[in-house]
Amino acid sequence: MSNLTARVIPCLDIKDGRVVKGVNFVDLVDAGDPVESAGIYEENLADELCFLDITASSDRREILLHLVERIAEKIFIPFTVGGGIRTVADVKAVLEKGADKISINTAAFQNPELLTHSSEIYGSQCIVCAIDVKFQKERDRYEIFLHGGRTETGREALDWAREAVGRGAGEILLTSMDRDGTRNGFDINLLKSFSSSLEIPIIASGGAGNPEHMVEAILRGKADAVLAASIFHFGEYSIRETKRAMQEMGISVRLD
């Protein structure tokens, strides 16, 4: 964690044009209209917004560019888009529709040159490498999974993260598949291993169940930002109260 202000980032997982949320990447339930949700989150002090088209990569569908454009027209906070980005042309199209950053997951792993070329053209500041990991007990290590968690790679997670950084990724969006949607808290050991080994910001994802979990991710896990979906989508906690909890624990946040 750097000395910068900690960021709270709601994530819109999009399927068939709707916001959805599941547990461990399955059992998806409808959580609302993405454009409406984006506007509400901005009003409620979100620092950034993340939009992930969760079926684009696996179904090989084109990114919902029209939806990206509508959300970008609605909000003024930084806006990251991922899902189905496979080429530099895809990166260009998403940025031209109003995204500030792009998030690449499966395609970056399968074609690491995509990170290299995209960062050379558009700058590392707008390239987020999304990494989905699961702890493999038999090998006692975290490993990379692709296609929304459906494809096992066998590659050690931090090894791939280091390569991604070397190729120009400006941030790592780190999701624990073991914790995703469980609301049992972030995987602190995973966060610490990444934040202590990498020089770029780490966005913690997977497991947020309450504001205290987010405080823990920043203070103990040394994450630079926390990303959450279900606890915000269904209204149990607001971003404002999450930030107040952070502030009470001495974390610098934006509250105006």
UniProtKB/Swiss-Prot annotation:
InterPro entries according to UniProt: Aldolase_TIM, His_biosynth, HisF, IGPS_HisA/HisF, RibuloseP-bd_barrel
EC class: lyase
Active site per database record: 13, 132
UniProt pathway: Amino-acid biosynthesis; L-histidine biosynthesis; L-histidine from 5-phospho-alpha-D-ribose 1-diphosphate: step 5/9
A GO CC term assigned to this protein in UniProt: cytoplasm
Catalytic activity, reaction form: 5-[(5-phospho-1-deoxy-D-ribulos-1-ylimino)methylamino]-1-(5-phospho-beta-D-ribosyl)imidazole-4-carboxamide + L-glutamine = D-erythro-1-(imidazol-4-yl)glycerol 3-phosphate + 5-amino-1-(5-phospho-beta-D-ribosyl)imidazole-4-carboxamide + L-glutamate + H(+)
Molecular function terms from GO: imidazoleglycerol-phosphate synthase activity; lyase activity
Main location group: cytoplasm
Keywords: Amino-acid biosynthesis, Cytoplasm, Histidine biosynthesis, Lyase
GO biological process terms on file: L-histidine biosynthetic process
Enzyme Commission code: 4.3.2.10
Subcellular locations according to the entry: Cytoplasm
Pfam family, one: His_biosynth
The protein's assembly and partners: Heterodimer of HisH and HisF.
Task of the protein: IGPS catalyzes the conversion of PRFAR and glutamine to IGP, AICAR and glutamate. The HisF subunit catalyzes the cyclization activity that produces IGP and AICAR from PRFAR using the ammonia provided by the HisH subunit.
Family membership: Belongs to the HisA/HisF family.
Protein name: Imidazole glycerol phosphate synthase subunit HisF
Organism: Leptospira borgpetersenii serovar Hardjo-bovis (strain JB197)
